[in-house]
Curated annotation (Swiss-Prot):
Protein name as annotated: Ribonuclease P protein component
Known function: RNaseP catalyzes the removal of the 5'-leader sequence from pre-tRNA to produce the mature 5'-terminus. It can also cleave other RNA substrates such as 4.5S RNA. The protein component plays an auxiliary but essential role in vivo by binding to the 5'-leader sequence and broadening the substrate specificity of the ribozyme.
Gene3D superfamilies linked: 3.30.230.10
Source organism (scientific name): Bacillus subtilis (strain 168)
PROSITE patterns (alphabetical): RIBONUCLEASE_P
EC supergroup of this enzyme: hydrolase
């Protein structure tokens, strides 16, 4: 994922948490915040130390990152924070992608199709 598409700073995370909206399912919590000054979407990932060991947490982040990259073109330009919950450690890639797609649909984050 390119640097300009990452949320890294604590102040950016806090801004999204404080002013953004959230949706959740059993595996993930998704926070979003509309940023008119940004013309690209940015994503931040968070996996608690309560989930597995470092290898497991990094695996979860890789799966989320890949699923997000595949959906990136269809998503609105906003700031996103994805927080993994404990059940996320048991998911395969396909299940991770499906779970994230569910959250994106639930919060109407897909761009309108131009073919209509």
């Amino acid at each position: 994922m390119k640097k300009r598409n990452r949320l890294k700073k604590n102040e950016d995370f806090q801004k999204v948490f404080k002013h953004g909206t959230s949706v959740a399912n059993r595996q993930f919590v998704l926070y979003t915040l509309d940023q008119p000054e940004n013309d690209e979407l940015r994503v931040g990932l968070s996996v608690s130390k309560k989930i597995g060991n470092a290898v497991m947490r990094n695996r979860i982040k890789r799966l989320i990152r890949q699923a997000f990259l595949e959906e990136k073109e269809r998503l609105k330009e906003k700031d996103y924070i994805i927080i993994a919950r404990k059940p996320a450690s048991q998911l395969t890639y396909e299940e991770t992608k499906k779970s994230l797609q569910h959250l994106f649909r639930k919060s109407s984050l897909y761009k309108k199709s131009s073919s209509k």
